[in-house]
Amino acid sequence: MKIYLSGSIKETEYRKEVKDKYSTIFEIKDPLEDVEKRINQKELDIFRKIGFSASARDVVDKIVEGDIELIKKCDCLVVFMNMYSAGTIMEIRIAYDLDIPVYIINPSRSMRKDPWIIYHTNLFFDSIDSCFDFLRHTYKQ
């Protein structure tokens, strides 16, 4: 089973924990690792320095289009979400539109009152372990 890891790029501990604990059971797809295959450090530095501009447009396209292609190859989206992140919200919507299940790990429970997040989510979990226990039992991994 292929799982796309979604969430703020600041959530590095979540990504590390998931890969350390579950990469032998599931095929974990981390877009932050995948993006390194699509753009080089020089392109990334230009984007971070300038932000949106004509010269950075190609970099933005490579990032977003690559993430969308990676989502299409996955069986579900697992999202760690305690704060709003534009990219994360877009990934949720894309998965929803593709009928790919969306599972949100939200320890603070802050997202469980947002009608838009609820609408596009299959299930919420309080912890990483509870989410992956569900996936293991549901998908017989």
Where are these regions (language model features)?
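Conserved catalytic or regulatory cores that recognize and/or transform ribose-phosphate-containing ligands
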Residues: 1-141
